[in-house]
Amino acid sequence: MAINLFTSESVSEGHPDKIADQISDAVLDEILKQDPKARVACETYVKTGMALVGGEITTSAWVDIENLTRQVICDIGYTHSDMGFDAHSCAVLNAIGKQSPDINQGVDRANPLEQGAGDQGIMFGYATNETEVLMPAPITYAHRLMEQQAKVRKSGKLDWLRPDAKSQLTFIYEDNKIKGIDTVVLSTQHAEHVDQKTVFEGVMEEIIKPILPSEWLSQNTKYFINPTGRFVIGGPMGDCGLTGRKIIVDTYGGAARHGGGAFSGKDPSKVDRSAAYAARYVAKNIVAAGLADRCEIQLSYAIGIAEPTSIMVETFGTGKVSNEVFVRLVREHFDLRPYGLIKMLDLIRPIYRETAAYGHFGREHFPWEKTDKAEALKSALR
């Protein structure tokens, strides 16, 4: 009997890095609405009193970067200077240039199916049957706590809540099966006038208890709610934020490997993003088909080359067939060339801003979460 602990964290939509991600993806969405062929690599930096939007964008679209940036910050909830960041008064700086023609000539082709990868790199996808969304439980419930924090904050039920927050969950596993939750950490920015007792009780009753299944909690579960005792200064006033700095929060909470490439602000020609989505799609369909309890996919690409340079499948001893057979199945049933996976998942759409908070995976309405290949995979092995 092997017992171990595993921990994952999430952050709220008001965390500085997530503000940056949401601005970058909002810019991407607005451009894709007007110009599906745009090439976008948009980066954002936020700090007290300012947001800097930069990167390389080649497009026929026009986007009011300043107003869009202010709208995103406002939607998150930073609408008054007493929060340390105000959508209405912060400076918005624009430092956007064009994509290098050296990159462009390797990506664009007369035949779309020959479209090359926008860069070299490695990408991972993962799925596990330990939750109904085929995601690891620690990251899934850490995200749900953060979604609940935002819901309660925006409803006004706890009017002292502010946008910046973080969660962290430590799960107990016995022989790779969940036995319970060992530790809950939740820190949330709050108004200056509220005391620690009020914060603790409010967070427990309105955020934690409605989300975490009671069967996973016990008298031994430890709760650390705002453990420093005070969290008034938050958001970009507390820390600067950058696009692409929460890549583990965005994916599997450390339960699977990561290729290192961030997602937000990148159009689907960037395989850092689109191939990571495709790898999740492949892994999820293998698990949904009942062919493995856990599955990790690695893909790799070379800049300007359409076919993946490698495909790896790992099922951690839970697969119904060998990993070599899985690789053959993947090649037969999934088109993992850049244009192929874009078509397969219908990625040239303005769907990205929503991905930029609460995780890119495990939310069923995104196209890479479909399990429409599961039956075909099962049939191929009969």
UniProtKB/Swiss-Prot annotation:
Under Gene3D superfamilies, the record lists: 3.30.300.10
Where's it mainly located? cytoplasm
Query: Which keywords has UniProt assigned to this entry?
Result: ATP-binding, Cytoplasm, Magnesium, Metal-binding, Nucleotide-binding, One-carbon metabolism, Potassium, Transferase
Q: Where in the cell is it found?
A: Cytoplasm
Positions contributing to L-methionine binding = E56, Q99, D239, K270
Return the annotated region ranges for Flexible loop.
99-109
Q: What is its EC number?
A: 2.5.1.6
Residue positions binding K(+): E43
Q: Which domain of life is it from?
A: Bacteria
From the UniProt record, list the reaction(s) this protein catalyses. L-methionine + ATP + H2O = S-adenosyl-L-methionine + phosphate + diphosphate
Binding annotation for ATP: H15, D164, A165, K166, R230, F231, D239, R245, K246, A262, K266
Give the record's pathway.
Answer: Amino-acid biosynthesis; S-adenosyl-L-methionine biosynthesis; S-adenosyl-L-methionine from L-methionine: step 1/1
The cofactor note from the UniProt entry for this protein is: Binds 2 divalent ions per subunit.
Q: Which InterPro entries match?
A: ADOMET_SYNTHASE_CS (IPR022631), S-AdoMet_synt_C (IPR022630), S-AdoMet_synt_central (IPR022629), S-AdoMet_synt_N (IPR022628), S-AdoMet_synthetase (IPR002133), S-AdoMet_synthetase_sfam (IPR022636)
- Record-listed Mg(2+) binding positions: D17
Question: What's any one GO cellular component for it?
Answer: cytoplasm
Q: Which cofactor does it need?
A: Mg(2+); K(+)
| GO BP terms | one-carbon metabolic process; S-adenosylmethionine biosynthetic process
Gene Ontology MF term list:
ATP binding; magnesium ion binding; methionine adenosyltransferase activity
PANTHER family registered for this protein in UniProt: S-ADENOSYLMETHIONINE SYNTHETASE (PTHR11964)
Q: Which family does it belong to?
A: Belongs to the AdoMet synthase family.
The subunit field of the Swiss-Prot or TrEMBL record says: Homotetramer; dimer of dimers.
Purpose: Catalyzes the formation of S-adenosylmethionine (AdoMet) from methionine and ATP. The overall synthetic reaction is composed of two sequential steps, AdoMet formation and the subsequent tripolyphosphate hydrolysis which occurs prior to release of AdoMet from the enzyme.
Q: What is this protein called?
A: S-adenosylmethionine synthase
What gene name does this entry carry? metK
